[in-house]
Amino acid sequence: MTEQLEFFPVQSPCRGICQSDERGFCRGCFRSRDERFNWNKMSDGEKQEVLRLCRQRLMRKLRVNKPAPSDEPEQPSLF
């Protein structure tokens, strides 16, 4: 399989929130401490891998925080 050529440098996913959650991942971009500190030293391939991991972490968080479906029908109360 051929590798896709990258014409532009991989941009940092930083959103300027820069706070760690209970697992040590940034609440804004979902990178670990090492991933944040070493971003500028990484190759584009390594950065792409970090971005893939960040997407996985985001999806995992969204699944965990998704409310369970209720058994009651969704009908507004009249009172």
Curated annotation (Swiss-Prot):
<dbReference type="Pfam" id="PF06945">
    <property type="entry name" value="DUF1289"/>
</dbReference>
<protein>
    <recommendedName>
        <fullName>Uncharacterized protein YdhL</fullName>
    </recommendedName>
</protein>
<dbReference type="InterPro" id="IPR010710">
    <property type="entry name" value="DUF1289"/>
</dbReference>
